[in-house]
Amino acid sequence: IVDVGSNKLKMWEIDIDWVNTSNSTITRISDLTTEPFSSQGINIAQPGTGQQLDALSGMTMVRLQYRNFDSYEVMMANHTVNVGGGRAGVRWYELRNTGSGWSIYQQGTYAPEDGENRWMGSISMNQNGDIALGYSVSSSSTYPSIRIAGQSSDAPLGLGIFDIDETSILE
């Protein structure tokens, strides 16, 4: 869960007893400190109308994707942030657990300097460690669209930099 205003990701563990649900528990296991971000004041324009789109900021998008690599576990997460001037970008995280609890292994904000808003992402990692981020794009000159970008497993790890260029899926 994104904790807007405190630059934290709150981690919860849920243990469900399907036979006796009163034995089920929800436990807050950690708060992970992120790089500073703001999710306020995002205005997503679209051509031909003054009607703006909701940035859905302040919450993680979709569900966190989980992968077990035997020697460590990974969860991928993302949410929308204000990258300046009310423009939206996608903040993404690779969370890792090597056996001593979850930590932020790498994080980054995808927001090329082209005036476009990027928000409402969905992020995942494959069995090779490649990361793909799909997201919505819009501006006063670009109709709402879908694009992807990513990070190859060959990229310098832990830096939060995408080395797979943005590609349009639907314009």
Where on the chain are the PLM-derived regions?
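C-terminal PAP-associated
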Residues: I1-E171
